């Protein structure tokens, strides 16, 4: 359908006297249709040269069809072709720019939403961390309270143990003192029994001794009366008088005066009226009432 009309291009790229684009030799990159009114087909190569020219001129807003045609230097390219293509290029760039702006707006909105969601999530995380820290603080406080109560209970148990030990020591000392007192009482009782037995033996020996001397055979040790010092003094004096009288009697035997004197002296010397038997060989004198 399409046919390419090719012609040679000058090496310097000059356009000669055909600056308006008419009656120009056709460039090799131009492709025209075979219609009665041929139309230009913008190939990729031609479009690239157009874009390069527009870029060199400062963009689609500053470039004009004439400046673009001069910059491109393509023979056979008219102002009509460049004007329509430049208009389409501007519209395409504008739509691309709008689409880019829209995409930027969308991305900004998305970023703002992401920022909002991230801030919300950060607030949630902060609240969760604060709640967890509060729970940890409460748990630590409860643990410290339990430890304090346990320490108090241990202190009470320690004091109670000390009191129990002190009371046990006190009771042990009282028990030792009681055992010691009982032992002392037992020793004293044994000594008392020994003394009692010794006294009984001495009394029996004394009664046997008196029986051998002829005083009496029925001598009661329980009724034995030991004379006092005054009675012993009177008995000794009476003994002396008796010895004196015996000497007088031996010198005046058969005298009635001596007989009366002997009768007169045979009277009691103790306060109770008992007579005293005085022997020459006796060591001490007993009352007559104590002799059975």
Swiss-Prot record:
Keywords: Coiled coil, DNA-binding, Nucleus, Transcription, Transcription regulation. Residues 137-157 form a coiled coil. Disruption phenotype: Embryo lethal. Induction: Up-regulated in roots by low Pi. One of its GO terms (biological process) is positive regulation of gene expression. One of its GO terms (cellular component) is nucleus. Pfam families: Myb_CC_LHEQLE (PF14379), Myb_DNA-binding (PF00249). Homo- and heterodimers. Interacts with PHL2, but not with PHR1. This is Protein PHR1-LIKE 3. It comes from Arabidopsis thaliana.
